[in-house]
Design a protein with these regions (language model features):
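Short, well-formed alpha-helical segments that are part of the catalytic scaffolds
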Residues: 1-10
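Catalytic-site signature of metal-activated, phosphate-bearing donor transferases
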Residues: 43-50, 57, 68-235
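Active-site acidic short loop of glycosyltransferases
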Residues: 7, 53-56
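A conserved acidic beta->alpha catalytic loop
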Residues: 4, 15-25, 38, 62
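Conserved donor nucleotide-binding strand/loop of the catalytic core
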Residues: 23-54
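Residues lining hydrophobic/aromatic ligand-binding pockets adjacent to catalytic sites
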Residues: 16, 55-56, 61, 65, ...
Length: 236
């Protein structure tokens, strides 16, 4: 990911306890590097990175995301212009096991990633929370690429990480473990989610990766509720 970002004025790399040599590589490429604890709320470290930026515009991305050359040119044109917008959204192409998922609510996966410095912030409360923008927001034409999961082992590791964080958030929000929620989280919500993603939104058109995505998206609802139950037992 890092070499393709050399077109930018500065690259800020926040390493969250990685063990693959990424930090050293970032230092070799001249990035501004920082080491931070791997906070379960990823937005805490994103907020930290944003505070280190010195340019007029910020574009943030994760290690499994890529910016095609067409998107680079569009970004350059906007930065050089006198645009009225404070931020820009874009479409993201999600890839599971090397396949771009065009259906099942996976595309267009709208993301807000580019904004003027000082005009965007996270509340740092939840892993999936959106950037809060001061001002008008536009839309980019070109897509960003997202290689979500390259293999099953990588997927299961991320699945465990995110479901644990979401269970903790449910605990903080006061979600109860009771008979009504048993039905809600073990039956109704997973079944509805799978049916919508796989059949109504056409996830079946994406073959095995589409089935995998829809199934585990539904399973995540059950697993995070199981983990909530575990947390409550541990705290009782």
């Amino acid at each position: 990911m890092l070499p393709q970002l050399q077109w930018s004025d500065e690259v800020i790399y926040v390493d969250c306890e990685s063990s693959d040599g990424s930090l050293g590589k970032a230092e070799e490429l001249g990035c501004k590097t920082f080491s931070r604890p791997n906070d379960r709320n990823l937005n805490v470290n994103k907020s930290f990175a944003m505070d280190q930026a010195s340019g007029d515009w910020i574009f943030y991305l994760d290690p499994d995301e890529r910016i095609p050359s067409e998107l680079v040119e569009e970004i350059r044109e906007i930065v050089a212009s006198e645009t009225e917008y404070s931020a820009f959204r874009l479409k993201r192409k999600n890839h599971y096991f090397g396949k771009w998922l065009k259906h099942g609510s996976q595309y267009p996966d709208i993301q807000l990633r580019m904004f003027r410095r000082g005009k965007g912030k996270f509340a740092n409360q939840h892993v999936h929370e959106k950037l809060q923008i001061e001002g008008k927001t536009g839309m980019l034409k070109e897509d960003m690429l997202h290689y979500s999961y390259m293999n099953i082992s990588q997927f299961l590791k991320k699945f465990d990480f995110y479901s644990s964080f979401e269970a903790g958030f449910m605990l903080e929000q006061g979600v109860q473990v009771n008979s009504i929620n048993h039905l809600r989280y073990f039956l109704f919500r997973p079944a509805t989610r799978f049916f919508r993603r796989y059949f109504i939104k056409g996830g079946f058109r994406d073959g095995i990766p589409g089935l995998f995505c829809a199934f585990f998206d539904a399973l995540n609802i059950m697993v995070r509720y199981f983990k909530l139950w575990e947390l409550k037992r541990k705290n009782s």
